[in-house]
């Protein structure tokens, strides 16, 4: 029950951040299109800082085992759910924004502060495992779908700052190399902005929309159902039958972290990707806002369901 309450509080905080972005545009201080600069800062600066900082922990056999369990669970989620969501997209004729909003969760913005508040800072590393796996899919699958590119540009993918930060973080962890305290503290400070910055972008975009159009669009409610109910239930079944929780003494906690990452609202980075590559960023932002609001109810319920079945 404590986790469920903290979940609701964290999501409510994110929604207030969206409101701040909304108000700064409505007050005439900024325009909704000004959010594009902040989107690029989140994608190419803040998220890499989160990843590098998370991997600055001591190398121990227990940590490695936990990382492997978290990685296996994260990869299982990403691969199986990709096929499932793609199938749903064909059946229900989902467009690029809808498919990516259903598939990609807002783990980068919500999971780190949530895990820190509920489980402690020492567990943030395992939440970043899911983020890292999702980032690989994000900069391959999501980028291709949103940008409408015919094929993958592997050179751009490999040289992407987010992908580089994942490999550098892993390398530093396994070699035991620790960054100077000044550098690591700087990474932590910049990385802590990921939630507020992403939510402010969403709010700024939301301010430029027609509310009646948003809430009259029945597609948004269907996408919200898929993102917050259908996908979490599929993930719950997968995690239950995989028995990955039995592979480590901390297995149940590791599975909880991965499940929390899966059941978050639609990724605000989809909105930012749409901005960068000229897709429908306002529709993506509307989905993000509606799913964030609805997740105040759905996330605690899903966590309670997980605790009942594991």
Residue ranges and their predicted role:
Residues 1-310:
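Alpha-helical transmembrane segments of multi-pass small-molecule/ion transporters
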């Amino acid at each position: 029950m404590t986790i469920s309450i903290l979940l609701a509080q964290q999501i409510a905080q994110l929604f207030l951040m969206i409101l701040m972005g909304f108000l700064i545009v409505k007050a005439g201080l900024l325009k909704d299109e000004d959010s594009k600069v902040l989107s690029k800062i989140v994608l190419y600066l803040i998220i890499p800082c989160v990843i590098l900082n998370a991997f600055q922990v001591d190398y121990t056999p227990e940590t490695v085992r936990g990382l492997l369990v978290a990685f296996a669970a994260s990869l299982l989620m990403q691969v199986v759910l990709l096929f499932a969501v793609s199938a749903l997209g064909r059946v229900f004729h989902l467009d690029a924004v809808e498919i990516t909003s259903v598939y990609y969760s807002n783990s980068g913005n919500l999971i780190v502060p949530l895990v820190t508040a509920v489980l402690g800072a020492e567990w943030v590393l395992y939440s970043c495992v899911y983020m890292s796996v999702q980032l690989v899919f994000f900069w391959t699958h999501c980028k291709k779908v949103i940008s409408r590119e015919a094929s993958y540009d592997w050179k751009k993918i490999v040289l992407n700052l987010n992908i580089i930060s994942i490999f550098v973080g892993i390398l530093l962890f396994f070699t035991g190399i620790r960054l100077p305290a000044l550098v690591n503290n700087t990474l932590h400070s910049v990385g802590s902005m990921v939630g507020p910055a992403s939510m402010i972008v969403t709010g700024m975009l939301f301010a430029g929309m027609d509310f009646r159009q948003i809430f009259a669009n029945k597609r948004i409610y269907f996408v919200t159902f898929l993102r917050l109910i259908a996908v979490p239930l599929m993930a719950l079944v997968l995690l239950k039958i995989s028995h990955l929780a039995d592979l480590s003494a901390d297995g149940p906690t590791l599975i909880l972290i991965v499940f929390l990452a899966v059941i978050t609202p639609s990724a605000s980075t989809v909105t930012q990707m749409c901005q960068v590559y000229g897709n429908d960023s306002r529709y993506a932002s509307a989905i993000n806002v509606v799913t964030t609001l609805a997740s105040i109810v759905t996330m605690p319920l899903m966590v309670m369901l997980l605790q009942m079945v594991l």
